[in-house]
Amino acid sequence: MGSLSIWHWILVIAVVLLLFGRGKISDLMGDVAQGIKAFKKGMQDDDKPADKPEPAKSIEHNAAPTAARSDVGSKAV
């Protein structure tokens, strides 16, 4: 009583075909296949090594000499 016989499965498949139709099921399976292909392609893209970044360019900075401040440590009254 707890197991489904072959007749139960045939009835379930017949109801599914009547509800969805043959065209909708094949379209659905095609969409699933495209999704799997896109997923596999995305996983393969992750395996490729990343492009090596160019080394950073150095910036030459000529700082002008500044005058020393004498009031650095004093408090204003």
Curated annotation (Swiss-Prot):
Q: Where is this region: Disordered?
A: 42-77
Q: Which InterPro entries does the record cross-reference, listed alphabetically? A: TatA/B/E (IPR003369), TatA/E (IPR006312)
Q: Which UniProt keywords apply?
A: Cell inner membrane, Cell membrane, Membrane, Protein transport, Translocation, Transmembrane, Transmembrane helix, Transport
User: Where does the record place Basic and acidic residues bias?
Assistant: 42-60
Q: Which domain of life is it from?
A: Bacteria
Q: How does it sit in the membrane?
A: Single-pass membrane protein
Q: Give the transmembrane ranges.
A: 1-21
Q: Name one GO biological process term.
A: protein transport by the Tat complex
Give the signal peptide range. none
List locations, semicolon-separated: Cell inner membrane
Give an example GO cellular component term for this record: TAT protein transport complex
Q: Name one GO molecular function term.
A: protein transmembrane transporter activity
Instruction: Family membership, please give it.
Output: Belongs to the TatA/E family.
Explain the purpose of this protein.
Part of the twin-arginine translocation (Tat) system that transports large folded proteins containing a characteristic twin-arginine motif in their signal peptide across membranes. TatA could form the protein-conducting channel of the Tat system.
* Subunit text: The Tat system comprises two distinct complexes: a TatABC complex, containing multiple copies of TatA, TatB and TatC subunits, and a separate TatA complex, containing only TatA subunits. Substrates initially bind to the TatABC complex, which probably triggers association of the separate TatA complex to form the active translocon.
- Its name, as the record gives it, is Sec-independent protein translocase protein TatA
What taxonomic ancestry is recorded? Answer: Bacteria, Pseudomonadati, Pseudomonadota, Alphaproteobacteria, Hyphomicrobiales
